[in-house]
Amino acid sequence: MARFNLTQQRCITRSMTYHMTFQKGYTCACCGNVHEELPLRYGSPAPALWFSLAPEERDERCLMNDELCVIDDEHYFVRGCIEIPVIDSEDMFIWNVWVSLSKENFKRTYLYWEEEGREKELEPMFGWLSTSLSCYPETTLHLKTLVHTRPVGVRPYIELEQTDHPLSIEQRTGITRARVIEIAEALCQGS
């Protein structure tokens, strides 16, 4: 695993962290509080497989930083963004998620990670969504994706395969402000 030279990092144990950007506020049905700002970004600190490992094994079996993860030198992940337009707004709702890559595609991603113009060198790569988003009625794990590399400092864009999964439909058609609030309340209840 050391050949990828990733900085090991301990992640928090909650499966979803709330990295937020905001719009006008709302009253939360979960906690009853008035929140001045509407969250438009959520993310997981690690791929789902990482959470299945015993905490005492994570440092030994995983190499991870904020953007890349290798587990047991056989599972390779990159962090990216599923972007969903917010209808009647210029805002984007963003899920920061982890996607698995083949070893070959991970090596190419790693090789170009800090190279200017990397987005021109790397074609879209197949991956499996490796983040569980609990506010969907069907599992989001293992949805088919394409990983689109963007300029250095910008997380890859994650394009879901066009299916009838609710997340895929939302990525194609957008979501309302009411749906953003529904997601915020669902994640509030799950925290």
What are these regions (language model features)?
Residues F4-I87:
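Basic, glycine-/proline-tolerant helical and adjacent loop/strand elements
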Residues I12, I71, I82-I87, I94, ...:
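Weak global preference for isoleucine
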Residues N5-R10, L111, P137, I158:
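Compositionally biased, intrinsically disordered low-complexity regions enriched in proline and serine
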